[in-house]
């Protein structure tokens, strides 16, 4: 009893971000400075392509989307991942809600998507989940699933993103995504350590990427058009 099995340790090494594994299993305290995703890992996952700041299309076709909906001065960001975990779509914009709903529907079509439904995102998600038509095609809207972020659930999703980056399981273009990832830092609170963007900085792309990675790694049944 109380003895860790090698298989359990190896599984933890696979499932946990490097700094969390080191703290829990190797008695190495978390450093006070540094990037939780790892600057060298971010660089290793960055595609050799032009910078992407707003609308960008890669070569692949999305099989999973993550949408972070704008709040106040933030941006709505959508990121689509192809079957290899490479970002193949980036949409970053500020539109009125009705136009946002239209853009999200047309970009996502019948591909499975996670949507941040926290706060103002709730009524937008409800609209996205309603059937809609594009010409002769009717989409059911069932491919959109909402995620309500709490501090703990958001941290868990960021840790999943950190694992994907540190394992080089995903790739993304330079620009808005890498800029946000590189500015993330450890935030220490009375309830523990969290990943966060500095005060006043945007984290919309990181939120969207974390949602897309979660959907890509845990795909549901795909809903189609009729």
List each model region and its residues.
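ATPase catalytic-site recognition across NTP-hydrolyzing enzymes
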Residues: 1-67
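A residue-level signal for conserved active-site and pocket-lining positions in enzyme catalytic cores
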Residues: 25, 161, 208
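Short, flexible loop/turn elements at secondary-structure junctions
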Residues: 29, 69-71, 117-119
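Short, flexible loop/turn motifs enriched in small residues
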Residues: 60, 71-77
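Structured core elements
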Residues: 65-68, 77-80, 114, 207-210
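Mg2+-dependent endonuclease catalytic cores in nucleic-acid-processing enzymes, primarily RNase H-like
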Residues: 79-191
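Acidic two-metal-ion nuclease catalytic site recognized across multiple nuclease folds
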Residues: 91, 209-226
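Short, solvent-exposed helix-loop connector elements
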Residues: 189-201
């Amino acid at each position: 009893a109380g003895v860790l099995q090698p298989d359990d340790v190896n599984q933890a090494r696979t499932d946990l971000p490097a700094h969390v594994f080191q703290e829990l299993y190797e008695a190495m305290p978390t450093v006070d400075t540094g990037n939780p995703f790892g600057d060298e890992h971010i660089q290793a996952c960055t595609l050799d392509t032009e910078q992407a700041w707003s609308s960008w299309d890669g070569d692949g076709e999305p099989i999973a989307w993550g949408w972070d909906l704008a709040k106040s001065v933030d941006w709505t960001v959508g990121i689509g991942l192809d079957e290899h975990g490479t970002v193949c779509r980036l949409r970053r914009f500020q539109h009125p809600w009705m136009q946002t709903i239209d853009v999200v529907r047309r970009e996502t079509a019948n591909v499975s998507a996670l949507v941040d439904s926290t706060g103002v995102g709730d009524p937008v998600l409800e609209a996205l989940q309603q059937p809609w038509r594009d010409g002769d095609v009717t989409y059911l809207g069932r491919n959109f699933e909402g995620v309500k972020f709490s501090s703990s659930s958001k941290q868990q999703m960021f840790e999943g993103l950190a694992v994907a980056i540190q394992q080089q399981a995903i790739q993304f273009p330079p620009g808005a995504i890498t800029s946000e990832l590189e500015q993330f830092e450890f935030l220490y609170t009375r309830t523990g350590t969290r990943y966060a963007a500095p005060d006043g900085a945007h984290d919309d792309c990181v939120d969207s990427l974390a949602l897309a990675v979660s959907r890509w790694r845990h795909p549901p049944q795909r809903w189609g058009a009729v």
